[in-house]
């Protein structure tokens, strides 16, 4: 489960061990809904309080040959505007202006999810 959180025309991303930027999130635990998983992961990884709103898309990402993961991306809204705090799970975190996303080293699926959620957020106002 991955979450797209947009604040002030910027999206929060974390840098992983492969030096790629990615959406924050994580794996489901037993008896946990996808929405519960995402809220828990955002709190653990970034100390952000979010509410997952809708599934944006899903896709399979091949990390290395023979190792693939199913990515399900949600559009999320913040339930409070806490300052994001980096956990030890990632190398860095940063709020990127939406206009910079396409130039980042990150899987195209994440970029598509960010574009989709950004368009929905703009449409709602």
For each predicted feature, which ranges?
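Conserved N-terminal beta-strand and adjoining loop/helix that marks the start
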Residues: 1-11, 58
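Conserved hydrophobic "DFG−1" position in protein kinase catalytic cores
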Residues: 5-6, 13, 76-78, 95
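The catalytic Nudix box helix
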Residues: 23-56
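Nudix hydrolase/Nudix homology domain
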Residues: 20-21, 88-125
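Short loop/turn segments immediately following the C-termini of beta-strands
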Residues: 16
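Structural motif
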Residues: 10-11, 20, 27
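A structural signal for short, well-ordered beta-strand segments
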Residues: 3, 55, 74-76
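Active-site-adjacent beta-strand/loop module that shapes the phosphate/pyrophosphate-binding cleft
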Residues: 60-83, 94, 121
């Amino acid at each position: 489960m991955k979450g797209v959180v947009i604040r002030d025309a910027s999206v929060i991303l974390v840098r992983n061990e492969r030096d790629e930027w990615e959406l924050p999130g994580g794996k489901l635990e037993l008896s946990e809904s996808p929405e519960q998983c995402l809220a828990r992961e955002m709190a653990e990884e970034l100390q952000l309080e979010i509410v997952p709103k809708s599934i944006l898309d899903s896709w399979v990402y091949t990390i290395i040959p023979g190792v693939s993961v199913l990515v399900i991306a949600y559009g999320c809204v913040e339930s409070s505007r806490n300052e994001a705090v980096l956990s030890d799970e990632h190398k860095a975190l940063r709020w990127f202006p939406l206009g910079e996303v396409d130039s980042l080293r990150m899987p195209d699926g994440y970029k598509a999810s960010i574009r989709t959620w950004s368009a929905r957020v703009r449409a709602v106002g």
